[in-house]
């Protein structure tokens, strides 16, 4: 938390300096959220399926996530835009369970870690003939360290990306897309969307080049006195070609495309004095083309929130506390996504119910 407050102070200081030189802040946002997941870990019967209740022995992972982000207009630097987001996760994993023999291995916390991520990008509209596109030049970073008696560096990944955004009509729908050239490196447990983590390579790390080709669309099904229903689709395709030989085979790693396809819909009730309810259903399918297996996650969330806006001299401050519960979760895994809980099969379904409670704060500058 101290590091996050330090980042916040730094960003606000830089923003103040930027504004003094006629650069401007478009928006800034902060969120803090507590997450607790549960699964069935009852001795003799636990199978990682079904709603097993909010019992201590069924706890899986406790996460505290804090996010700080914003958007600046750098007037003195040729009207470049600067988009940034910093994320910190504090994780505790609890109750190590042997699903094969249906018994608890460790009662209570058996791992603690902290992960820092950032995504910082300069962007600008570039005109090529009659075509105008927003180009990004950005850097993504992710690093994890163990905490307390689990201390130790667990891995780092970096991604430098550059490329334009564009629009395309596909199956009768308009998609917003991105095409980016990528340089990446990774070490330890981090994979950077590669099919293998850094520790899978002989030197414990690797680097390479690739590309991102992402498509996204969304829209309204209805918006009336009964509330509103929105849908969304994202189709992410990330090519990674890493240099180096794998520990397992002694051969060069194959190039791979990470496929991440998400479809979902969210219904929100009409607001009553700022309060609203919501239901979200979503399906996410993931695969690495260079490896055997896939992961498919279907979930249904319910939630209750409150949203209000406060007019200030500099803009509008939005406060949005929200509580959500994942009542349905079916995560089917196969092959490389298998966590080894069963020796007899590499394909099975697991379930994690999850409770989330958090606060979102945003400032839209006039």
Listing of model-derived features with the role each one plays in the protein:
Residues 20-73, 81-97, 356:
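Short glycine/proline- and aromatic-enriched beta-strand/turn motifs that initiate or cap beta-hairpins
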Residues 58-66, 112-120, 154-162, 203-213, ...:
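Residues that define the transmembrane beta-barrel architecture of outer-membrane proteins
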Residues 171-291, 300:
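Detector for outer-membrane/organellar transmembrane beta-barrel domains
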Residues 20-28, 73-82, 123-135, 166-178, ...:
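Short loop/turn motifs that connect adjacent beta-strands in outer-membrane beta-barrel proteins
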Residues 1-22:
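Gram-negative bacterial Sec-dependent N-terminal signal peptides
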Residues 325-327, 349-366:
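Outer-membrane beta-barrel "beta-signal"
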Residues 41-58, 92-113, 144-157, 186-206, ...:
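Outer-membrane beta-barrel translocator domains and adjoining extracellular loop/strand segments
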Residues 30-38, 82-90, 135-143, 177-185, ...:
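Transmembrane beta-barrel strands of outer-membrane/channel proteins
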